[in-house]
Amino acid sequence: MADDRITGHMSSHDRPWDKVLINDLTVDAILGILPEERVQAQRVVINLTIFTDTQPAAKSQNIADTVNYAELSSQAAQLTVEGEYLLIESLVEDVAALTLDHPTAKAVTVRVEKPQAVSAAGSVGVEIYRQR
């Protein structure tokens, strides 16, 4: 349940999931429906909270036992730039699916913002929570 992440609900492994964070991943990409957004790349900021169990990696010190945030950051940035999405909603769903392809990721919160899209706002964006 989505609210479980907020309430600290115990998962099937008897404790709340750990979190791997990717904060303020910034890329310039074509994203939006307005004509000017289709020709001029704009700044896009991506934030991921990946819910997982970090204990196996802590014990083994093997990157294969956790979410490789460097690799995932690169993949999410590439997806954003190459996708030339019309809607943020489509992008966040694809980034969530990409994240959940990793075998240790149990759930993810994806937030994508466009800081320059609305001049009177600090940013506009979409945030979703998805789980396996």
Summary of predicted features, one role per range:
Residues 2-132:
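N-terminal, polar/charged subdomain of small-to-medium soluble alpha/beta proteins
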